Structures are given as C-alpha cells and as structure tokens.
Amino acid sequence: MSDKAGSRATMRGWAIRAYGEEMVLMNELPIPTPGPHDILMQMRSAEVGDWDELVRAGEWDMERPFPLVLGLAGAGRIAAVGAAVTDFSENQEVYAYSYPLHDNGAWAEFMLVPQSHVAPIPASLTPVEAGGVPIVGLTAHETLIDVLRVTRGEVVLINAAAGGVGHIAVQIASGLGAHVVAAASRRNHDFVAGLGAAAVIDYDATGDVAKAIRAQYPGGVDKALNCVSGKAANDYVAALADGGKMVDLPGAVSVQRAGVQIISDYVVRGNGARLAELTRRFDSGALRLVVHEIFRFDEAPRALDLVLARHVRGKVVIRTT
C-alpha cells in the first residue's frame, strides 16, 4: 500500500448509522484493506444522484454493516492493489461504480472496489470531472445498446434529457443514428439540441406530452428511456408506437398498455469493461460530460439536496480531495 494510505489507519467519510438517518461526516472510519482482486482508490471525486437518497433511506439495501459510507461511484488514484491484480497499478487514475457496494461507499477519502469494476479515466476529463461519469454513463450505454438495442433510423424518446443520465443518453442514441426526441424544460432546449436531439418537447408547457409527441410523430416512438418519477412517467407510455419498448429506470410507470414492453426498475451493475468503452467514447469526442456544479467534500449534503430538487443540467460532483 502506498505511503499516503499506509501511514494512516482511518479516513473521513459521509456515513449513516442506520437506514433513514441523516448522514454525518465521520473522521475515524477504517481504511479498507484490499483482498487479492481488489483495488483501493484514494478518491478525487464522487458522483451524486438520486440513488444516493434511495440508499440513505434504506430503499436500496446495500447489505453492508453500519456505519455505511454513502456514494456508489467516483474517480481516484490507485493507492493499493491486491496480490492478484495485474491490469492496474498504484498511482493510476481510474474510476469505478460499485453496486451493490463491495465495501465502503465513494463519499470518503478511500474506496475499495473489485478490479472488474474499474477502468482508466478519460484523458479528456480531469480526475474531478471523471467522477461524474460512471453511473450515468453505464446506465445510458447499457440501456440504449443492450436493452433497447437502438438502431439507426429509430425514433427514440429520452425524457429528463438535460439531466445526468439524459444528457449522456441523447449523445449515445444520436451517435447510433437514432432520431432522438428529447423532453426537457424550455430553458434546456438549446442545450439538448446541441447534444444531438432532433426534436425537443417542452414538458413544462405541454398539457399532454404524449399528444404533443404524436403531433410530430403520429405513429409514436419506437423506443423510450424514462428517467422521471411520479405520475408524469405514465404520460410517456402513450407516446410509444405499437410494439414499442421502454426502459423505466425509476420504476415509476403504473399504467398498463397492450402491445408495448416496459422494463421497470432497471439498475446497472459495476462493469469495468463497459467503463473502458465509455472512456474510449469520451476520448474520441463522441461523448462529453456537462458538470453542473462541483461541491467541496464538506458540502456533500448540499450536493444531494440540489440533485433532489431536480433542476440540474448534467452532473453534480463532490470533490473529495
């Protein structure tokens, strides 16, 4: 283990003592020790998303002991590697997503992850920016390519298109040759159009969003990625074409409709190989990350509050070091 971690036994981290409790900054959490196939990351930054609130509230049980450090993904410098790790070495800048948590979470000075969940960060991003990629990047990439199997010429609807998952999904879908219909607030129309959306629907001004979509696409959309919660999610089901398919990330859709397929509560797992593919896409210029705001480590609760207010363009990141 490097001197940076080896000279210390404890670290700081934002943790909860039980599900449903408020997070607190703890100063003497144990620094994890890598097993044979593990990587210990000294964190540069951590991703923030509404999933962090699901973990805090106990809706996503991590099956880990308390105190539980929050945060599922981020970027950092490799502080130590397990004896069986051959593809990575100390001091490499990497990023990772760990769900369910392998050990502790990312909102700490160090995070322990399996080597299979790790990839080098894009050279086109700073280590702090890179911490905003893993969850939203993996989610957009996996749902569009593996689950929805988006192909050239298909009409693909992406709502909350200016958000974390949404703004990456618009770029991936348009890069696949799809005709992207993005749903976003008026202030974000130029933003999502600049990412590759062929059409933008103003969900704030539209009383019936499905009707507005079908006014432009009478046959409906072929595929849809739903990123919104609440009753609003149901409105998008009517926009699907017969035989259409939707991935409903939050599991918010409660209506049924014959002739369409809805895959609910879809959650990606850690995948270093797919993260490496995202790295290649960022470095080729096919993808760009928009960071809404970077918070200091001691401002983690404020960062989560901002995300939950749902007025974020792109990603919110915590700078951990």
Regions found by a protein language model. Name each.
Residues 30-47, 59-100:
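Glycine-rich beta-strand-centered segment in the early N-terminal region that forms part
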Residues 92-93, 110, 155, 175, ...:
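Residue-level marker of beta-strand positions
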Residues 101-115:
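A structural motif shared across PLP-dependent enzymes of the aminotransferase-like
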Residues 227-288, 320-321:
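Glycine-rich phosphate-binding loop and adjacent beta-alpha segment
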Residues 131-205:
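Mid-domain Rossmann-like dinucleotide-binding core that forms the NAD(H)/NADP(H) cofactor-binding site
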Residues 207-219:
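Short amphipathic alpha-helix with an adjacent loop that forms part of the alpha/beta core around
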Residues 1-9, 275-321:
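C-terminal hydrophobic helical "lid"/dimerization subdomain
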Residues 88-89, 150, 240:
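Short, well-ordered loop/turn sites that connect or cap secondary structure elements
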